Structure formats: C-alpha cells, structure tokens
A protein has these predicted regions:
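Thiol-/selenol-based redox modules, centered on thioredoxin-like
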Residues: 137-218
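N-terminal "domain-start" segment that seeds a small globular fold
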Residues: 1-23, 155-163
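Solvent-exposed strand-loop boundary residues in beta-sheet-rich modules
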Residues: 15-17, 122, 192
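Short loop/turn microsegments at loop-to-beta-strand junctions
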Residues: 7, 29-30, 183-185
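Flexible, glycine-rich phosphate/dinucleotide-binding loops
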Residues: 40, 73, 125-127, 195, ...
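Short active-site neighborhood of thiol/selenol oxidoreductases, capturing the structured segment around
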Residues: 20-46, 50, 63-67
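Structural microenvironment flanking redox-active thiols in thiol-disulfide oxidoreductases
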Residues: 45-138
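Structured loop/turn residues at beta-strand edges in well-structured enzyme cores
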Residues: 4, 60, 114, 178-181
Length: 218
C-alpha cells in the first residue's frame, strides 16, 4: 500500500454534494468508493453497502464519497451517464442488464439514490508512449506479487499488460495514482487524512476497519 493522502484524491467534476476539500474533511474518517457506471458489481453490492455504512456511521464521523472513474468502456463510463444515474436513477449498459435480470430496478430505474457526495475522477487522454519500462512499472503496481513469479509467468503478465496499454486511450488520475486493480474499489483514510486501506471487490473487513478508524482520535 502506498503513502498517499486524502489530498491525493482527484475529483474533476462534482455531480452531487460538492465541492469538498481535504481541509473540510479534517478530523473525519473518509471512505472513497470508486466505481464505474458500467460496472454491475458496483451497483449490486458496493454502492448499496456504502449507503448502509453512511446511515450507520455518518453521525460518528464517517464521510463517504462516491468517485466514478473510467479505465475501460470510455463511451459508457462518462460524466453524462454519471449525472443521469445520480439525478434520475437511470443506469446503462451492463449495469442495466444485470440489475434488470435480478429484479433490482423499478420502472427501469434504481430504487435507491446515493445519499452522499458524488464526483467524477479526472480522465484525460493517454499520451505517454508504451515502453518496456512503463509495462514493467504497471505490472509491479497492479500485481504486487509480480517479482515472486517465475520467468514464464512474468513474461505472460508483461504481454498482457503491454496489450492492455496499447489499446488504452485514456487514463483516470485517481484510479492510476492509487494503483487500483478495477472497480469496485474502496479507499479508506483515517481522521488524520492518512491512507489506511485500499481494497478491490467485495470487502468483508471494511466495516471493522471503519470502526477502528472511528475509534481513533484525530
């Protein structure tokens, strides 16, 4: 886990509840839920869980921020579709398909709304050339066990990373700065704004970590 601080979170556009600065969050435990609008798992599990945490711990000092990002499907994971979801409950693409399949939409819309601040990660054009050094750096950032792999396994990973970078036209600043593995991801900061946890997928230990941070003095 890196040594980034709360101030390293980049929000390009606030869609709901912002702008919020790191100074305004001083003394609070901050949980940043990183998602994509075209990410079924984000809407099936992570965001509903975040709503529960917000309702349970808001008065005890927990602040949750929803941060939409885009590391793929750039035509779907857009600011416009984020605004649509937040303002009307409309979802798109694979998210719509999955939630429809599980009967989790009402009249084609979300049955819930996010009760906390929501913003969009800064997504910019990828201009850095794909060099061997960049491929290796990515491999080590996104796969911490890379150096422990066999030579054959390392070459397979490098090949996959190189192919990914070759077709990657955009980069999301917060997503890459914190070396997130995908969405949903959770980034937890303590009351001092120091990074306490970065997790990918469903996080079973999340509530206990939040409680530990809330119990600590600022």
């Amino acid at each position: 886990m890196n040594n980034h601080l709360l101030s390293d979170i980049t929000v390009d556009t606030w869609v709901q509840g912002g702008p919020i600065t790191a100074d305004e969050l001083a003394g609070s435990v901050v949980l940043v839920e990183v998602f994509q609008v075209n990410c079924p798992g984000c809407f099936l599990y992570t965001l509903p869980k975040a709503i529960q945490l917000h309702e349970k711990y808001q008065e005890k000092g927990l602040v949750i921020i929803g941060l939409a990002t885009a590391f793929e499907d750039y035509d779907k994971n857009t600011l416009e579709n984020l605004r649509l979801m937040v303002q009307t409950g409309d979802v798109i693409g694979e998210t719509f398909k999955a939630l429809s399949q599980y009967g989790m939409l009402k009249d084609g819309k979300l049955e819930w709304r996010l009760p906390f601040a929501v913003g969009m990660d800064r997504v910019v054009s990828e201009t850095e050339p794909v060099t061997d050094e960049k491929v290796l750096r990515y491999a080590r950032e996104f796969l911490p066990t890379y150096d422990a792999l066999s030579d054959e396994q390392q070459q397979a990973v490098l090949s996959q990373v190189k192919n990914y970078l070759a077709q990657k036209t955009m980069k999301a600043e917060t997503f890459e700065r914190f070396a997130l593995q995908g969405t949903p991801s959770s980034i937890l900061f303590d009351r001092k704004g120091q990074l306490r946890d970065v997790s990918f997928g469903q996080v079973e230990h999340q509530q206990s970590l939040v409680e530990q941070c809330l119990a600590q003095a600022g």
